[in-house]
From Swiss-Prot:
<dbReference type="InterPro" id="IPR050085">
    <property type="entry name" value="NAGSA_dehydrogenase"/>
</dbReference>
<keyword id="KW-0560">Oxidoreductase</keyword>
<keyword id="KW-0028">Amino-acid biosynthesis</keyword>
<dbReference type="GO" id="GO:0005737">
    <property type="term" value="C:cytoplasm"/>
</dbReference>
<keyword id="KW-0521">NADP</keyword>
<dbReference type="GO" id="GO:0006526">
    <property type="term" value="P:L-arginine biosynthetic process"/>
</dbReference>
<dbReference type="Pfam" id="PF01118">
    <property type="entry name" value="Semialdhyde_dh"/>
</dbReference>
<dbReference type="InterPro" id="IPR010136">
    <property type="entry name" value="AGPR_type-2"/>
</dbReference>
<comment type="similarity">
    <text>Belongs to the NAGSA dehydrogenase family. Type 2 subfamily.</text>
</comment>
<dbReference type="Pfam" id="PF22698">
    <property type="entry name" value="Semialdhyde_dhC_1"/>
</dbReference>
<feature type="active site">
    <location>
        <position position="117"/>
    </location>
</feature>
<keyword id="KW-0055">Arginine biosynthesis</keyword>
<comment type="pathway">
    <text>Amino-acid biosynthesis; L-arginine biosynthesis; N(2)-acetyl-L-ornithine from L-glutamate: step 3/4.</text>
</comment>
<dbReference type="GO" id="GO:0003942">
    <property type="term" value="F:N-acetyl-gamma-glutamyl-phosphate reductase activity"/>
</dbReference>
<protein>
    <recommendedName>
        <fullName>N-acetyl-gamma-glutamyl-phosphate reductase</fullName>
        <ecNumber>1.2.1.38</ecNumber>
    </recommendedName>
</protein>
<dbReference type="InterPro" id="IPR000534">
    <property type="entry name" value="Semialdehyde_DH_NAD-bd"/>
</dbReference>
<dbReference type="GO" id="GO:0051287">
    <property type="term" value="F:NAD binding"/>
</dbReference>
Length: 310
């Protein structure tokens, strides 16, 4: 049976990517609202309520409004890509590889909150260490990351690419979120199983897509006996048996001179690396992903496929 899918916000960066990924599929029927009609609330509500799955690619407030339009209609399942519901108790977090049971939870859920791009990498690195008891309570986790500028949506893309834009940017890299109140921190804490908020420092580079997320650690402050080998083993065990999150072998990581933020552009996978210096007791965990792939639209389509397989 063909599933009806409505992408609310299909003309934005994430919406366009999701639509493109489903353009040639015959198992789904894409319901669409013309761009000139996108502010027609009645038409939008009708399409939302006509779908089997509504994928919301909207700002937080608009997503909340869309969900309110579906109140009482349990026939429509929802995937929301905003930050509005990522720590809500009655929503399922849409990171299927987060633990062994998460894929089944997504499969049976009515409401799925698609993860943020930065949290996808951070949680992938942090949660297995918390689950294994390696990362203790109270540890001051810091997360440093750089994203391609497409993560800022159409406005930032225009600022980076259009030289005639009144706010054209010529910088190659900048740090933001300087007030340390980035909207992705709550989901990093909640789904990373942390008991205190991580210190998150995001930045943007002059490349369209791609992402690196880093979590530096001090071995002396981890569980007794922790080594880069035991950390790598915990990551490997956590993601064993699936093919989306790949943990790079320690011997292969040791041969690298650099890690490329753009390595997985156009792919929906993620790579995790563990680097260590036994002499200093320093470890650096690194995640590489496409911010619009596993970090956004790819994850949304993956979640949709899980929900359709129920």
């Amino acid at each position: 049976m063909t599933a009806k899918i409505f992408i609310d916000g299909e003309h934005g960066t994430t919406g366009l990517q999701i639509r493109s990924r489903m353009a040639d599929r015959r198992d789904v029927e894409l319901l669409s609202i013309p761009q000139e009609q996108r502010r027609n609330a009645a038409l939008r509500e009708d399409l939302l309520n006509s779908a089997d799955i509504a994928i919301l690619c909207l700002p937080d407030d608009a997503s909340k409004e869309a969900v309110s339009m579906l109140a009482g209609n349990n026939n429509v399942r929802i995937i929301d890509t905003s930050t509005a519901f990522r720590v809500a108790q009655d929503w399922t977090y849409g990171f299927a590889e987060m633990d062994k049971a998460q894929g089944d939870k997504i499969r049976s859920a009515r409401c799925v909150a698609n993860p943020g791009c930065y949290p996808t990498g951070a949680i992938a690195l942090i949660r297995p260490l918390r689950a294994a008891g390696i990362l203790p309570d109270g540890y001051p986790v810091s997360v440093n990351a750089v994203s391609g500028y497409s993560g800022g949506g159409k406005q930032l893309i225009a600022q980076m690419e259009d030289e005639s834009h009144p706010e054209h940017l010529t910088v190659n890299n900048y740090v933001y979120g300087l007030n340390l109140k980035h909207k992705h921190v709550p989901e990093m804490k909640a789904h990373g199983l942390l008991d205190r908020a991580p210190l998150f420092s995001p930045s943007v580079g002059r490349f369209p897509q791609g992402m690196i997320v880093q979590v530096p650690l001090f071995l002396e402050d981890l569980a007794d006996g922790a080594t880069v080998e035991s950390i790598h083993a915990a990551l490997s065990a956590h993601y064993a048996g699936q093919d989306i999150v790949k943990v790079v072998a320690l011997e292969d990581s040791a041969k690298l001179g650099r890690v490329d933020a753009e390595e997985l552009v156009g792919q929906d996978t993620m790579k995790l690396f563990a680097f260590g210096n036994p002499g200093t007791g320093h470890v650096n965990l690194v995640a590489v992903l496409d911010n619009l792939g596993k970090g956004a639209s790819g994850a949304a389509v993956q979640n949709m496929d899980l929900m359709l397989s129920a």
